[in-house]
Amino acid sequence: MSEFGGLSIALSSLQAQQRALEIAANNVANASTTGYTRQAADMTTLGNATPAIFSTSSGDGDGVQVSAVTRFRDAFLEIQAGFQHGSLASLDQTNGTMTQVQNLFGEPSSTGIGAQISNLWSAFDSVANNPGDAGTRSVLLQQASMLASTINSAAGSLQQLGTSETSQLSALVAQVNTTSASLAKVNQAIQSGSVAGLDVNTLEDQRDTLAQTLAQLTGATIQEGSNNQVTVSLGGLNLVAENQSQSLSLDTSGSSAVLRATQGGFALNVTSGQAGGMLNDINTVLPGYLSKLDGVANTLRDQVNNVMSPISGTIAAGATDQSAAGTLQFGLALDGGASTTVSVAGADWSGAGGAAALQTSLQTALDTAIGAGNATATVTTNGDGSLSVAIAPTGTHALQVQASGANAGFATLLGSTPVGTDGIGGRAFFTGTNASNFAVSALVAGNPSAVAAGVAGNGSLDGSVALELGDMATSNSGADATYSTMIQQLGMDAKDVQTRDNVQQQSVQSLDAARNSQAGVNTDEEMTNMVEYQKAYEASAKFVTTLDSMLDTLINMVGP
């Protein structure tokens, strides 16, 4: 090796050590940068040139070079990270929703639905103890109205949670589409850079970050392909493949929300990621608890109404064709025969003497409708002014009612669960078909005298009906049990999701620790490497100084 060859070797060392120092400095600078992967300089020996014919070579080499910059990344760990983070995001989402549902009901509580149902039975008990007192009846109506309002509010809050999550899911879909398009562009840049022989490590960091984001949002799977590009798949759809991306859309037009591929419109089965958690909340969790709350409301309605106005026989109410205002129109089917429509006009159920007038009109209409049939229908006026309709022989009969105007109250009398109120029959205490429209009947609300405290005909001081309802407080069935079962199920479901969420968090933490141990920056290690590169740089510089001194001596020796 000539002296000038030594200078060339020293120069290559200076350049290589300087490059290694720059890489180490970049690692330290990005130690806290999300998605950054630790890099290191790969140094290789520069082989000496092939000697010419009849010449020799020492074979010592011609120095050093940085042949590549390596990213410390495990592709298998990245794939596992996408899967595990997607599962965690789904559980986090549902766990948060379950917490909101629990907070919504707020049980146990002195003001919750459970306590208010108990207060309702206590209010009935107070009416039973003093049935003639309008004040206790007013308190009962206030308690019933408060309970109905609380049930309505809970139902509305559950529906609002679903609406809110649907809006969030729509925004998430837009984020997925933007991220997919960005990843496709990065894939293209990586391919172009790799072909050109450029350093694409920074682009690969961006690629991995975008791919992990898609996995966390949707539960998509990640697969690395050729030229360091990735393919991201979701439910049979390639969200991203090389430099192409597909967009998603949220479809809420059906009974369930579903994600669809914008191109082709086919539905995607998304069960993981934040989107999977949201879809589970929107389609299953929230509707499930709303249905359970509907069951509580309907059970309470029937529990109270059935006690207030027991009725024998099988008279079922249903709508018929609309009739003119002030006209009662109903159909009567006896012993399986054809239904006959009967109209009673001009009878005002709401006014004084209305029951008697309606009795006459209804009896005449029924007799005409039955004609020569093998059944009879008898309308009688009770001592308290209410009407009774008796159909004989017993069997399955259908009495359909359509009422309007002043006669609207009569429809309740002939309903499937009509009520007696101090002998004034035909008024349901609770109405509604679900938790959203559950309410105190308009015929009772604001009218304490309409509260059925006793059996029709026993007088206004009979409190037997209210007493029976008050005793519901010790019942092991009914609305109390239905609501208690719902709250217990809510607690178990929430605990189950929370437990699975905690276990998944531990799995993700272990996986992330393994990823960070390989790809993360250890500043102590980098500082040690920098000292090593610096010393090597100083040694190379010292070598240059030594060669310079040797050349100077040699030149002076052979000089004039």
State what each model feature region is.
Residues 1-560:
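S/T-rich, low-complexity, solvent-exposed segments of bacterial secretion/appendage proteins
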